[in-house]
Amino acid sequence: GINDEAIARAVDGWDVITTPLNDVRRIGGFSNLKQHWDADEHLRLKDLRHMYDILCTRHPDYKVDADAVLNGRTAAFCNMFIMRKEIFFEYNEWLFPLLDEFADATDFSKMDVQTTRTVGHLSERLLNIFIAHKQRTGAHWKIKRMQCVHFLRPDPMTTLEPLGTEYGRVVPVVFAADNNYVPMLATTIYSMLKN
């Protein structure tokens, strides 16, 4: 069963845990991740190219890894991962300036709801590029790939009460999602509340 002890056993000793690597040839016969991106009617190749340019300008040493990942056939999708704290902080310090620069230069006002999720799709690709770069440059992280679980009947929901001032500054967090992302949102919200 899934309980605290089982989860601790599953994650103990690993530096990074992600969803399994999916081969885009099996998802839809795509030859690489760029083609996979371009086939999605809600994603624009110009956005992927813009992020690539931002990444290569800010971090030229990542170009070889971006090329390998985007021209490659496999990636961990769903933006779901567990990392050692110091790796997580390093990843966020690297990731969010890239996403911020992209978002600042992008007009979201004429996008449909799904296309406004482009930043999330970009961050999926960036996770793979970050890991590829770190492994290529000698991080030697122990990486585990675990299946993504979709809970059909999670435990009954508890009623959430508004946070009082005893918690200090309260920061609202907003997600753009539909019913397909409820499991991921529930996990994210639970993690934020606990940490």
Where are these regions (language model features)?
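N-terminal anchoring/stem segment of glycosyltransferases
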Residues: 157-195
